[in-house]
């Protein structure tokens, strides 16, 4: 029972976090030579690409929470 509540809460927080994250872009100076992108820049680019799927991810999390309540609720 407690594990169900913990898992339900985790998925709820996950759904909220996915729907509300904002990414800060690093300021680029036009006079500075371009260098290799850092790991942080690559992660930021990946999260920017994943941002298009955030509504689907949030709905998926809510669907999984519903299934947990239906199939594993007492």
UniProtKB/Swiss-Prot annotation:
Organism: Ixodes scapularis
Family per record: Belongs to the SMIM7 family.
Top-rank lineage group of the source organism: Eukaryota
TM region positions: 53-73
Membrane disposition: Single-pass membrane protein
GO cellular component entries: membrane
InterPro entries associated with the record: SMIM7
Protein's UniProt name: Protein SMIM7 homolog
S-S pairs: none
Keywords, alphabetical: Membrane, Transmembrane, Transmembrane helix
Places the protein is found: Membrane
């Amino acid at each position: 029972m407690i594990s169900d509540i913990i898992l339900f809460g985790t998925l709820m927080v996950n759904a909220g976090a996915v729907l509300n994250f904002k990414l800060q872009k690093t300021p680029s100076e036009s006079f500075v030579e371009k260098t290799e992108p850092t790991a942080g820049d690559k992660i930021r680019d990946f999260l920017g690409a994943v941002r298009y799927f955030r509504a689907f991810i949030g709905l998926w999390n809510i669907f999984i929470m519903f299934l947990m309540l239906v199939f594993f609720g007492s």
